[in-house]
Amino acid sequence: MPYRASVGYTNQQGTLETSKYERGTLDLSLSPNFFDKHLTVNLNAKGVVTSQRYASGGVVGSAAFFNPTIDPYFRNDDGSIDYTTTNGYWNYGSGRGEDFTPNTLLGAGPLSQLYDRDNTARAKRFIGNAQIDYKVHGFEALRFNLNLGLDVSSAKTYDGVNPGSFQAYTDTEARGWGQYSWTTNFRRNHLLEFYANFNKEWDIHHLDVMAGYSWQHFYSSDHSVSYFNETHEQKGEDSRYPFNRQENYLLSFYGRLNYSIASKYLFTVTLRDDASSRFSEDTRWGLFPSGAFAWNIAEENFLKDSRAVSALKLRVGVGQTGQQEIGSNYPYLARYYMSTDVYKTYYMGSAGHMFYLTPGAYDPNIKWETTTTYNVGLDFGFLGGRINGSVDWYLRQTDDLLNSVITPMGSNFGNTVLTNIGSMENKGVEFNLNFIPVQTKDWNLTVGFNGTFQHTEFTKLNNTDDPDYNIQTGSITKGTGNLLQIHKVGYAPYTFYCFQQLYDQDGNPIQNALVDRDKDGKITQADRYMTDKSPNPDFFYGISLKLNYKNWDFGFNGHGSAGNWVFNDFASANSTSNIDINAGNLPNFARLVKKTGFTKANSGEQWYSDMFLENASFFRMDDINLGYTFNKIGNWKGSMRVAFGVQNVFVITDYSGVDPEIPGVNGIDGSIWPRPRTYSLRLNVNF
């Protein structure tokens, strides 16, 4: 019986002090077959145990702004460390020992963030799968497949601060000793999938028909409780409602038909009927059809024997898909949310205290988001495949977009609601090219390049087609309201909505001087403008190269984008020295402060200036590898490859932030966390 077993262990030190990650894995696979291979069984089981300690993400920024002339420790008169004041780590504030008063405006120092906070997590996960495939005896063209899956995980997270730390002295509930919390998370996913497949060839015909059923159940449970340090007094939990439990179901009936004639003309039709418990009974089901046709031109008689053309296929298709991954399991239900603040309770007499229950916003008519895609493509190959690739034109029209939007005052129970907001169009051209310019006995060179030109815009956002209707989104650190971007018809998602900066004759920005676009003599929200700039690139691409010479191999991979914009929120939030100077401290100023010389308090509008909006086009060399393979070492019949590699080699960009590739979709950069460069030396041995 075929089987495979493996054991793995990973121990990785983080970029920051105190951060680390450990993982242990165990895999087992069994693949028996019965009845002359008509019945095949695949059993897979994988167990994973992880342990991780997190370092505070704010420590990088804190260290960058910390005054380098200050001793990072509090000292006694004899030079020893004064552990009675914030555990010895220097922090902004006044007084010493128990009389220490923290400067909450400037926050904890970098050493306190690193060593006086303990945030650890331990997790266990099991992934199991059993797949049974049966080919009917005497009618082998028909087979049945049953797939059963289970994914279970549990995690426990500890997050707390040390007594006597800066963080403990800023805790209004437990001043001086602080508190900690335990959070437990449980996830379980069941899968049952069954399908029948009929595959038959006769003469010049090939028919492949499949019909199936899929059922999934997702369950989650979360529980969190906080304690005061030292006294271990429990708080923050209502024992009557100790857990947050949620679940959802996904049900599907589906079918697919593939039919080809002489391998020249290929037809495909698919149909899915999906149901999600995240929607009400009236909108739960979604029907999503698709169809495609391909013409294998290279198989036609006029090209079949061509030496120049080795492959040529024309493809056209249209199809629909549904989206229900919205992050909420009950968006159509009216629900109440319980307060977690022990000071916000109702006194219920002998029943004790009950936490506040607040109604949440909901949409009883929320339904599937539907995307219709039109595609025309051409696959090609020339000179025996030494030049090959594809080019595709596509148009994606998404209707009933699912998103959270701000609700008009008094129209719902909450400031935002998850609902269907309108339609969006995405169109473009994507291509993939591969070349083999050199191919000899000793030399082989392969070059690949792929790219996509795209344009995305909203085509509808409400039922009245109001051209001025918009949805504000995209929070930044400073400012009133904090929303920097707008969804609006005719513009790309997350288009930046800024004030226009004024500059002096030398090109330097003038603090709090912005363009009065409506010419009413004052700067108001009406002076903001649609910049027509968004984080969505006009073009993104990838490049690869692989070179072989005898036993040597060399290669690299890179990718990049053009036309994408990023708002440097870190620069915006730290664009003036006013806060630091007024706090009576002299830390390291941000580079932008030194450049602009801003010393006044920024106006509420200055934070939204387009001076912080930057072109984030870039090219990143992802990795470079060089290796050598030893095929013969004495009488040994195996082989050995030694390779050296570098990941995150370099980035070419005009963006002033640390990294033009920022997490998330809205293009707002509020972090200065660096991406590591990794050097590796690898040894692969084959027996």
Regions from the PLM with identified roles:
Residues L111, S276, D506-N508, S561-V642, ...:
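Extracytoplasmic gating/loop element in the C-terminal half of outer-membrane beta-barrel translocons
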Residues D520:
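Acidic carboxylate motifs that coordinate Ca2+ or other divalent cations, activating on Asp/Glu
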Residues R23-G24, S29-F35, T40, N44-V49, ...:
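Extracellular/periplasmic, surface-exposed regions of secreted and cell-surface proteins
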Residues S534-F567:
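Glycine-rich, aromatic-lined ligand/substrate-binding cores of catalytic
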Residues A513-R517:
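Calcium-binding motifs, dominated by EF-hand helix-loop-helix domains
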Residues T416-E425, D466-F496, D527-G542, N574-I579, ...:
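C-terminal extracellular loops and terminal segments
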Residues M1-S6, T10-K20, Y92-L105, I581-N582:
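Surface-exposed beta-strand-turn/loop segments characteristic
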Residues N11-T15, A275-S277, P437, P535-P537, ...:
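A generic structural motif
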